[in-house]
Amino acid sequence: MNPDLDTGHNTSAPAQWGELKDANFTGPNQTSSNSTLPQLDVTRAISVGLVLGAFILFAIVGNILVILSVACNRHLRTPTNYFIVNLAIADLLLSFTVLPFSATLEVLGYWVLGRIFCDIWAAVDVLCCTASILSLCAISIDRYIGVRYSLQYPTLVTRRKAILALLSVWVLSTVISIGPLLGWKEPAPNDDKECGVTEEPFYALFSSLGSFYIPLAVILVMYCRVYIVAKRTTKNLEAGVMKEMSNSKELTLRIHSKNFHEDTLSSTKAKGHNPRSSIAVKLFKFSREKKAAKTLGIVVGMFILCWLPFFIALPLGSLFSTLKPPDAVFKVVFWLGYFNSCLNPIIYPCSSKEFKRAFMRILGCQCRSGRRRRRRRRLGACAYTYRPWTRGGSLERSQSRKDSLDDSGSCMSGSQRTLPSASPSPGYLGRGAQPPLELCAYPEWKSGALLSLPEPPGRRGRLDSGPLFTFKLLGEPESPGTEGDASNGGCDATTDLANGQPGFKSNMPLAPGHF
């Protein structure tokens, strides 16, 4: 044995042990039990926490408002809005179960809940994001059907079919997101305080295709077809409406009672005018579908802008390490996708007055009491109200045509003057309603008018509890003239176009024999 070698080995052992000991505590490949926590920057933690906390709170409140708006307003319960509610549910689930823990990770700089919960968090993240974009894919298909087949839409897209489509969305989202929980992921890091999205190359490619690129292709194809169909159909229908308006010769106002609404429709058919089969009705329904498509097109556009950078960076960084972005850039891209969850509750009220009014009623705690006022407004510009007293009555219309269109979707504006006939709400028709009474109006009737009948003494400004009647606009004169005056049976109509405001005021005493 060489003593020098033995001596050298023995003298170097303590030094080697010291180096090994230091490496265990400070080396880069440290274990979870020996790792040290990163130093917390209090100022940065507070500022980031406040910003992300406000963002998460806004996303939660906004998506709850969207859900309650549809739940508390019967006229918003349409198949299209069911898809919107499903999108809000996905964003709400993301805001409750994913974003708080993502914000904690950003504030503290490390994961505090262990490896198992990290895997669950990542899977729920993929689930919610996939459900969101698949909901947008279903919305785009729904909008194409609504624009392409606007008259047949209620029979093609029923509530049952919409619910089945929503269930399919969540089933597909679960299939795409469950892979990492079943072991389809990269090996877990040694440090349990590290947590992030799965970057296993093939799963990253699979999830990007299933969660984003394939639905995105469907969305773009559907909205391109919507644009083509909308442009062609609008041109054809507007041309038909102008031709129909030129052939119209009269403006008829009728009072409908509860029991004789169908008789009123038959009287209009006898004059050769069928509101339900007119081109104007088709244009109105098509315009409503096209407006909804525009609103949801904005939603889809913002979703693409928010999530496209992430779904570009994730597969490229997983497949090619040289193309992986810096951590700071990846965090910004990551949270940009999350930011989409609070955008939709902003887009809906800005693009739809129905959602805006629903939001205001809910914020004012008027979810239930607002229903009755909404029904009154639905009569609005195209349905006037009359409550009889002894032998007189009060007939008043002060709702603009535009507001009535936004509330009920049953009136038209612009060139859409021929209105679909719709029964008044049964809740506003008293018992013992009288037969319909035909009235007439000045031929130069314009939107934004105010009609009134004399009120009996002592009853001014008061509403009577008697039966409520409505009369609706069923036609339009070809040109001003005296034909209406000759057949009005004593009604005195005058125009009021002061200051360039279209409208008229008319005093029309009702015939006593009708009540």
Swiss-Prot record:
One of its GO terms (cellular component) is nucleus. CDD domains: 7tmA_alpha1B_AR (cd15326). The chain crosses the membrane at residues 46-70, 84-105, 116-141, 162-184, 202-224, 296-319, 327-351. It comes from Mesocricetus auratus. Residues 71-83, 142-161, 225-295, 352-515 are cytoplasmic. Belongs to the G-protein coupled receptor 1 family. Adrenergic receptor subfamily. ADRA1B sub-subfamily. Keywords: Cell membrane, Cytoplasm, Disulfide bond, G-protein coupled receptor, Glycoprotein, Lipoprotein, Membrane, Nucleus, Palmitate, Phosphoprotein, Receptor, Transducer, Transmembrane, Transmembrane helix. The modification Phosphothreonine is found at T264. Residues 1-45, 106-115, 185-201, 320-326 are extracellular. This is Alpha-1B adrenergic receptor. One of its GO terms (molecular function) is protein heterodimerization activity. A lipid is attached at C365 (S-palmitoyl cysteine). GO terms for biological process: adenylate cyclase-activating adrenergic receptor signaling pathway; cell-cell signaling; phospholipase C-activating G protein-coupled receptor signaling pathway; positive regulation of cytosolic calcium ion concentration; positive regulation of MAPK cascade; regulation of cardiac muscle contraction; regulation of vasoconstriction. Residues 410-424 have a biased composition (Polar residues).
